[in-house]
Amino acid sequence: MEKLLLLGDEAIAQGFIDAGGSAINSYPGTPSTQITEYVINSKQAKEQGVIANWCANEKTALEASIGVAYAGKRAMTCMKHVGLNVCGDPFMNAAIIGTKVVLVVVADVPSMFSSQDEQDSRFYGHWAMIPMLEPSNQQEAYDMVHYGY
């Protein structure tokens, strides 16, 4: 396997591509924007036919990924913490019925650095009774996304 030097967002995107991801649907918002941009600009993703979409908001992005997952393909949605509030309804519905979709929330937990508010979205994972992972470095970010599929 080729060794790469990647930022955290890039490691998440590369893990998705290497896992055979089919579609990424996102709403732009720093710092999660870089994940989707990496997929859009990736030669490997283009060769694999990965579809990347910017959506009207986080709710429609997650709903699009849920639709892809219903079709049996691997999908991911990326957003920052406040976006999770916007897509709360489809998030809980997907958790209840067991939809296999990966949701990546970036720039979370107290001590905000890239947002207008501060929240701890880990409570969403507990509330929905779904796995919630917290990588501590780029390799863990890659591995968690790659093996998560």
Where are the model-predicted features located?
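Thiamine diphosphate
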Residues: M1-E140, V145
